[in-house]
Amino acid sequence: MEVLTMNGYTIAIVGAGLVGERLVSELRRREFPIQELRVLARSARTVEMAGEAFEVGVAEPDAFEGVDFAFFAGTEGEKGAAVQLASEAISRGAVVIDNGSDFRLDDEVPLIVPEVNEDALENHNGLIANANCSTTQMVVTLAPLAKAFGLRKVVVSTYQAVSGSGRGGVEALEDGRDDVYPKQIAGNAIPLIGSIGDDGLSTEERKMVLESRKILSLPGLEVHATTVRIPVHTGHAESIYVEVGRDVELAEVLEVFGSAPGIVFSGEADDFPTPLEAAGESGTFVGRIRVEGNVINYWCVSDNLLKGAATNAVQIAESLVKARV
């Protein structure tokens, strides 16, 4: 892909919600080279995103003419923008980076977390999937453990912010909107994200199991997840239990986390980062590290709208620019 001009790339962001807004701010913050930035949605309108006013265009095939990178951050499913329009964007020369779940498990589509499997970008055919928010922060922490010690089993419980449900989730917490969650979210914890399948797993739990195996290239990895929505605005937290391939010492684990890409770690095993501290930051924070034999327990938090969505997507584009693939 040799689309860089003297002035940068033409970017399209499909979706003007929370993730779309964070994409604008991350592209600016990370100084991604932009010649033109288009915001597209179902209907034309003027919106303010990241402190800028944008004339939103209609997301339709011709809107992708001349686009180099198209970030999809809108509705998922059969009627979603990516399913309807990703192929149209690709046929016009764009590389599509999709934040939704529609293509993540497609064998022909790389599912990317750059700190973990950037090399998988070599095989893309114009469409790249951004991982689920809760999966992303987990695999950022699992990958260095896998490299150092090997992985046998993972058990994770999540505590996920309402912004993971979009503006509707925020409104449910702040204004009492009652059509977003199956039970009241304010002052509560809901151990159901998505719907429950025949296997007893929720939609979110299944994503974590299947996506982590694909990203880590460990198709047989034993992963057990329980995902919970909590009344926090931004920032997902996870309690993770890992069985590794050999007995380890605490000092070894601290060294691994302290040198791993994408991880923010104070160096103190007893440190306890919280969603409030992670909000607005692009890294994955780790703390409460405990070791017994071949078992490692730890806590991680990350901004679900940044590393869990927008930052990871922009990192993918940066990787493509660097590699020219």
PLM-predicted stretches and their roles:
Residues 2-185, 221-222, 278-280, 284-285, ...:
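N-terminal Rossmann-like NAD(P) cofactor-binding subdomain of oxidoreductases
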Residues 70, 162-325:
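Charged docking surfaces used in two-component/phosphorelay signaling
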